[in-house]
Amino acid sequence: MITRLLWMTQKTPPPYSAEAQSIRIGGRYEHYKGMPYRVIAVARHSETLGELVVYQALYGDGGLWVRPLFMFTENVVVDDQEHPRFRFIG
C-alpha cells in the first residue's frame, strides 16, 4: 500500500490539520441524538494516517468510541434540517 510505504519512510507523522486542532480535548460534546460525550484525544489510524476522534460516553457504561474526524465534525440532516453531528457544550 502506497500510504503505508510513505509512512514507513517518514520519521514523524505529518502535523494534525487545523480542523483536528480545533477539537477540544477533555471537552463535552452532545451528539445530535442528545447523548453527551467527552473527547479523550485526536489520534491517527496506524495504516492510513487518517485523523480520528476518540471519545467516551458520559452515560451507561462509559464506553469508548472512535470516529473519523470528518464524520465527527460533519453536519447531518434530520427532518430536512441540518445539524452538527456533535456540538461542543463545554
Please identify what each model-predicted range represents.
Residues 1-90:
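Mixed-charge, low-complexity intrinsically disordered regions
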